[in-house]
Design a protein with these regions (language model features):
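Conserved donor-binding/catalytic core segment of Leloir-type glycosyltransferases
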Residues: 10, 189-208, 214-217
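Aromatic "clamp/platform" in nucleotide-sugar-dependent glycosyltransferases that forms part
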Residues: 280
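Short hydrophobic beta-strand element within catalytic cores of glycosyltransferases
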Residues: 297-300
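Conserved acidic donor-binding segment of nucleotide-sugar-dependent glycosyltransferases
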Residues: 312-313, 317-324, 333-336
Length: 367
């Protein structure tokens, strides 16, 4: 009997993590576990921010001893290699993990498959070693065309050395529906027109467009008096955004919810009349898929990965994030759209994601 294939995945986070990259990594691990002939996937996460409540595949070994520092992470990887070094290839789940992935690749004499996401690879790394090691990867996977283009340009990689596998949306976890009456009461949204953006409130992620929507509110209020901007997420930039809203006289029209769990997200998305994120540094924009899967019209940027999430305007409105008037037009257009889940969202289904991963793995796991 032929032995099963084993894959080693070095990743930032997946199960127990939050955000688009963690969700992507979960789907990637599931797809690898479902690859025909796969006997085991060994994943070593760098962090596990939340509880490990998600159900995991039986053939996934999720190593939890590499948390809390680089030394512990390296030791966890070494322990995996000592126990059984027989892997088909190494998946490097983030460019910052490339140094350790490179060492493992040299030791095992196996190829490295690097996954890249967004602004983290749009320009050279501040760590010169990482920039040097990029030429040694066998292949890379980007979640979007724009990230692939920017990465190959500065890294001087052949276009053929990269593939695109966008995020997946698990439609069964979402669905269209009425606004949740409890949440309407909790946030005082009865009779309000709700715009929404979800994301980490960090100085490093101001490119998501929170400021642009707040600055546009005075003008929007003149046209729609009951309009409210709901910002979902937590982070150190919240206080600055709150002060900005107050200074502009729209403090009463901006609602900050704080952190919202994955299980609560669908009910929150359904509160929106339009999901708006005029970003200028988003690698893809998984939140657009989530909003669309809840039947919410969306407004995305025409200059970053958001345009790919809405399939270049097929699934939602595209606007110039640096043009306030264009953003306003996009919002007003979205507010006139019916609440419905577009059929073309199936393009991003998990089954299609898994097929894309399996086609890629076939090239790296040949007998």
């Amino acid at each position: 009997m032929a032995k099963g294939k084993r894959f080693l995945v070095l990743t930032t986070d997946a199960f127990g993590g939050h955000g688009g990259i963690a969700l992507y990594n979960r789907d990637l691990l599931l797809a690898l576990c479902n690859f025909p002939g796969c006997s085991e996937v060994v994943a070593v996460p760098r962090s596990i921010p939340g509880p490990l409540e998600d159900e995991r595949p039986n053939n996934l070994t999720y190593v939890t001893t590499g948390l809390h520092g680089k030394v512990k992470y390296v030791m966890a990887v070494l322990k995996v290699l000592r126990e059984n070094p027989d892997f088909e290839f190494i998946v490097c789940g983030h460019i910052n993990l490339l140094p350790i992935a490179h060492l493992v690749g040299v030791w095992l004499r196996k190829p490295i498959l690097l996954f890249v996401y967004g602004i983290d690879v749009w320009q050279p790394s501040k760590r010169k070693l990482i920039n040097k090691l990029i030429k040694n990867i066998a292949h890379f996977v980007s979640i979007s065309e724009i990230t692939k283009e920017r990465f190959t340009k500065w890294a001087k990689l052949s276009d053929k050395k990269g593939s695109i596998i966008p995020n997946a949306i698990h439609m069964e976890n979402y669905g269209a529906g009425d606004k949740n009456s409890r949440l309407i009461s909790q946030y005082g949204l009865d009779g309000k027109t709700v715009l929404m953006t979800l994301g980490r409130l960090s100085a490093d992620e101001r490119y998501k467009g929170f400021d642009e929507i707040i600055e546009l509110l005075p003008e929007l209020i003149r046209e729609i008096s009951g309009i409210v901007y709901m910002i979902i997420g937590s982070g150190g930039d919240r206080e600055r955004l709150q002060k900005k809203a107050m200074l502009l006289g729209v403090g009463g029209h901006v609602v900050f919810t704080g952190f919202v769990s994955e299980s609560e997200k669908p009910d929150y998305y359904r509160l929106a009349d339009a999901y708006v994120m005029p970003s200028y540094g988003e690698g893809f924009g998984f939140v657009f898929l989530e909003a669309l899967a809840c039947g919410i019209p969306v407004v995305a940027s025409n200059i970053d990965g958001g345009r790919e999430a809405v399939r270049h305007g097929k699934l939602g409105a595209l606007v110039d994030p640096h043009d306030a008037e264009d953003i306003k037009k996009g919002i007003l257009k979205a507010l006139k759209q019916p609440r419905m889940i577009p059929e073309d969202l199936e393009y991003f289904s998990y089954s299609n994601f898994e097929q894309r991963v399996h086609r890629l793995v076939t090239e790296f796991a040949k007998d």
